[in-house]
Amino acid sequence: MKSATLLALSFLLIASCFLICEAEHSRYEEHEILEENMGDVVNLEQRSCAKPGEMCMRIKCCDGQCGCNRGTGRCFCK
């Protein structure tokens, strides 16, 4: 009985670690995309939005992807 309890607790610990890591990774990726949208002058044409329908340079994106005009820096829906 003790070994079954220990095995179950080990499984729960591993599962919770996996879920925590997965949650942190998705937030980190979203943060990176938002940071890219805020001031990456080098990659203006390759900016993307973290979530569909999000604002990119104050312009709402259509499908989660937006492009940026080199001259003005304003984004448009792709």
UniProtKB/Swiss-Prot annotation:
Q: What is this protein called?
A: Hainantoxin-XX.3
Q: Which domain of life is it from?
A: Eukaryota
Keyword annotations for this protein, in alphabetical order, are: Disulfide bond, Ion channel impairing toxin, Knottin, Secreted, Signal, Toxin
Cysteine pairs forming cystine bridges in this chain are 49-62, 56-66, 61-77
Q: What does this protein do?
A: Putative ion channel inhibitor.
Would I find Secreted among this entry's keywords?
yes
The residues forming the signal peptide are 1-23
**Tissue specificity statement from the Swiss-Prot or TrEMBL entry:** Expressed by the venom gland.
CC annotations in GO: extracellular region
Protein's UniProt keywords contain Disulfide bond: yes
Pro-peptide residues, renumbered to this chain, are 24-47
